Amino acid sequence: MRIYPVNNLRGAINLPGDKSISHRAALLSAMATGETRIENFASSADCASTLRCLQDLGVEIRRENSTVFVKGVGKTGFHKPLQELDCGNSGTTVRLLSGILAGQEFDSVLIGDESLSKRPMRRVIEPLTQMNAEFESAAGNRLPLTIRGVNPLQAISYKLPVASAQVKSCVLLAGLNAKGKSKVQNPKSKVRLPSSRNHTELMLAYLGAEIEENFIESEDGFVQEISIDGNSKLSAKDLQIPSDISSAAFFIVAAACLKNSDIVLREVGLNPTRTAIIEVLKNFGAEIEVLNRKEICNETVGDLRVSGSGNFAPKTNSNIIGGEIIANLIDEIPILAVFGTQIENGLEIRDAAELRVKESDRIAAVVENLRRMNARVEEFPDGLKVYKSNLKGAAIESFGDHRIAMAFSIAALFATGETEVSGADCAAVSFPEFYEVLGEIVS
């Protein structure tokens, strides 16, 4: 994919449905009683993996463009699969589906592509083993993962060692098939807010689950505890998926960095556990306005208007991002690092070691590609520091990672000269229409 610099971006665009919410909509609809209509379902290959696995478990699914119809089978109505369940590149599919399969009375095997097969699954194996499910895995707790389900599972109280929406969701989904109430505690936080994405909790409540959230206060912070009753039943309800803010982040950064840009991103999900990217960009001077804010299916949604200024410096006198906020920024860090090349005195990102075990080693991938584009950058075990730099077009390696491909395609828009991104088609993992949508607003 060859990309050339542009003057600015202009126009209003619709983005695909949120990937995180789409996964959960499909899985919870399958566990519900009745048929669910899901509108604006994500077009990503990852979400297609979730649908395919559910079909292999006997769930009837029909897709009409971006609308998906799911006939729920209830909490224990899944069929023993006739083959291995292929999760493709989707870690979300593996981890959330593990929670459901742990409570079924049959064995199943989860597999994935080469990238996913390198990612450790210990964080879901541990709590599910405590709930009496049994597992066999490849060396290092990797795929293929055999799950020997039990029903009912044993309810547990589980303290997450690190904030993780996927592990939390896995335990909550398993809790639907447990005897009694299962509880999940997030790590202590300085603020009385969820410390990871809460799409699962919001959707469970919307579909009728008996789920409670409490904040346990101590002298030095708050511990969020979520409990779910194994007697809960889910009832089908139509769902509308907001546009994906993680996909929106690429266009927000592009428009902010190109002077005289003016774009509107329609009906973007503005869940407070996902808007850290907007807060960070605004703190550095990006001009972002929220319009038409509303609630849809328990999720906050609004239009985002972004104007290009091209002048960025921190309002808080700190160019360092780290600590608790990282859990709510983890998918946006590659594009945030690109943005750092445009900030006065640059940007330092810490406490992001989790990026080492994503679809690629994202820290190493970002550092290498920034250096190829003439940026000055330092690498740390848990992050990086990028200095304000005049980017130059270069040969970029995507490493088969969709977020790397898209982040450096955006960098190419305000670099000097031609940039070629190898393996750019991997963007389809989360955003198949990325280059098409970008073309709509380039001027």
For each predicted feature, which ranges?
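Structural preference for solvent-exposed beta-strand-turn elements
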Residues: 1-443
